[in-house]
């Protein structure tokens, strides 16, 4: 290999490029909906058994480019790219490590998610019960059920937060969680699944907040 040759990378660069365009299109829609304010939020898709395609930190989600999606290993280290991924990358990779079937993780910061995280922080969770839209979640085939969405305390120590998430995953199945004053993580086996879970939670959280207002609690 001569001095100007590019070293081979341990993942399919064409696949990374495909995923970048797939993610960018979806993220742009989320940005237009107001779910990614002030360059917040991060999004990822499984690249292969050992790597994940993920957005770099600090980019305006309304105008991402292909180079704003990089590859990281399952420990969250950038592979073949000079950019340092967000510290929150760990919250993505822990899910890919734990669940080989998971294909996509979405982290958003909508107004509804952030307000709900504040309102229910004291309880530590929000219970969504008897909504028809609960059938949008993998494993739910009836509205006659309850879905508990955890609310974790915000912290800059991602190792602590990841450990708390892992502990709860040992006890219950879930497709998303809130972080107090921060936002929401959702995931699924495919991008379509993760997006469906995100949209369902966004709608149901809005319903719960509106009900609190109608009852005079907010």
Curated annotation (Swiss-Prot):
Main enzyme class: lyase
Comment on bound cofactor: Binds 1 zinc ion per subunit.
Keywords: Amino-acid biosynthesis, Lyase, Metal-binding, Methionine biosynthesis, Zinc
PANTHER family reported in the protein's UniProt record: METHYLTHIORIBULOSE-1-PHOSPHATE DEHYDRATASE (PTHR10640:SF7)
GO terms assigned for molecular function: methylthioribulose 1-phosphate dehydratase activity; zinc ion binding
Keyword Transmembrane helix (UniProt): no
GO biological process: L-methionine salvage from methylthioadenosine; monosaccharide metabolic process
Source organism of the structure: Xylella fastidiosa (strain M12)
Reaction equation(s) it catalyzes: 5-(methylsulfanyl)-D-ribulose 1-phosphate = 5-methylsulfanyl-2,3-dioxopentyl phosphate + H2O
Origin organism lineage: Bacteria, Pseudomonadati, Pseudomonadota, Gammaproteobacteria, Lysobacterales
Family stated for the protein in its record: Belongs to the aldolase class II family. MtnB subfamily.
Cofactor: Zn(2+)
Top-rank taxon: Bacteria
GO CC annotation: cytoplasm
Pathway: Amino-acid biosynthesis; L-methionine biosynthesis via salvage pathway; L-methionine from S-methyl-5-thio-alpha-D-ribose 1-phosphate: step 2/6
Function summary: Catalyzes the dehydration of methylthioribulose-1-phosphate (MTRu-1-P) into 2,3-diketo-5-methylthiopentyl-1-phosphate (DK-MTP-1-P).
Residue numbers binding Zn(2+): 107, 109
The protein, known as: Methylthioribulose-1-phosphate dehydratase
This enzyme's EC code(s): 4.2.1.109
């Amino acid at each position: 290999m001569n001095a100007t040759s590019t070293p081979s990378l341990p993942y399919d660069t064409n696949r990374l490029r495909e995923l970048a365009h797939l993610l960018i299109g979806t993220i742009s829609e989320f940005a237009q909906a107001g779910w990614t304010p002030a360059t917040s939020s991060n999004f990822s898709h499984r690249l292969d058994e050992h790597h994940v395609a993920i957005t770099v930190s600090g980019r305006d989600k309304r105008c991402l480019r292909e180079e704003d999606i990089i590859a990281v290993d399952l420990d969250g280290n950038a592979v073949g790219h000079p950019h340092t991924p967000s510290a929150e990358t760990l919250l993505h990779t822990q899910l890919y490590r734990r669940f080989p079937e998971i294909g996509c993780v979405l982290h958003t910061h909508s107004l509804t998610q952030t307000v709900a995280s504040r309102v229910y922080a004291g309880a530590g969770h929000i219970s969504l019960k008897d909504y028809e839209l609960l059938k949008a979640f993998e494993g739910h085939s009836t509205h006659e059920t309850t879905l508990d969405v955890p609310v974790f305390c915000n912290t800059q120590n991602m190792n602590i937060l990841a450990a708390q998430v892992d502990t709860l995953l040992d006890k219950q199945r879930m497709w998303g969680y809130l972080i107090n004053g921060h936002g929401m993580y959702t995931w699924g086996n495919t991008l379509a699944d993760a997006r469906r879970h995100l949209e369902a939670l966004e709608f149901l959280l809005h319903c719960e907040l509106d009900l609190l207002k109608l009852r005079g609690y907010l």
